[in-house]
Regions:
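Short, well-structured N-terminal submotif of metal-dependent ribonuclease cores
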Residues: 1-38, 50-67, 141-142
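A conserved hydrophobic position in a structured secondary element of the catalytic/binding core
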Residues: 5, 37-40, 79, 122
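A generic structural signal for short hydrophobic patches within well-formed alpha-helices
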Residues: 10, 42-45, 84, 127
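Acidic, PIN/NYN-like endoribonuclease modules and their adjacent C-terminal/linker elements
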Residues: 1-2, 109, 113-142
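Active-site neighborhoods of divalent-metal-dependent phosphate/nucleic-acid chemistry enzymes
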Residues: 47-58, 74-122
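General small-molecule cofactor/ligand-binding pocket signal
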Residues: 36, 77, 135
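Short, flexible helix/strand-to-coil boundary loops that buttress conserved ligand/catalytic motifs
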Residues: 14-17, 49, 91, 130-131, ...
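A short helix-to-beta-strand connector/capping loop
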Residues: 31, 72-74
Length: 142
């Protein structure tokens, strides 16, 4: 199974002093080559680093971001034609149902859908509505 890690998962694994053991166990049991990030996730992390007012924390987060960029340098999925088409389908479906989703979440879900991947997120409520296969590493058992 190939996982597209949502921003909350990356933050848990890289910035917490003691990441949740369920999350670390889930991804220790998964080959690194089967874990991807969306360019949207990277952008959300960059925005979070830039918005951190405490310079010490900002520096720590910037180091974590640099490590993530290094580790995933060849596994950062961009948004192309198939992802854009999946995004449009998600947007139309949810709009017709009277439900909304933040564009970053919809783009991450669209990337997973277009590539046949599983989205790993704590944000099950919003992601599941998109039709993407979703796991919550905080709840899933190995």
């Amino acid at each position: 199974m190939i996982y597209l890690l949502d921003t909350d998962v990356v933050a848990e694994l890289t910035t917490r002093a003691r990441p949740d053991p369920r999350v670390t166990a889930r991804f220790r049991s998964t080959a690194g080559l089967n874990r991807f990030l969306s360019v949207i996730t990277v952008a959300e992390i960059e925005a979070g680093v830039a918005a951190t007012p405490d310079p010490v924390r900002q520096a720590r987060y910037a180091r974590a971001l640099a490590a993530v960029r290094h580790e995933y340098h060849d596994r950062i999925a961009s948004i192309g034609g198939p992802e854009a088409a999946a995004y449009l389908a998600i947007h139309k479906t949810l709009k017709a149902a009277g439900a909304g989703i933040d564009p970053p979440d919809a783009l991450i879900a669209a990337t997973a859908l277009a590539d046949g991947w599983t989205a790993a997120t704590r944000n099950i409520k919003h992601m599941a509505r998109t039709g993407v296969l979703v796991i919550n590493p905080w709840e899933e058992k190995l």
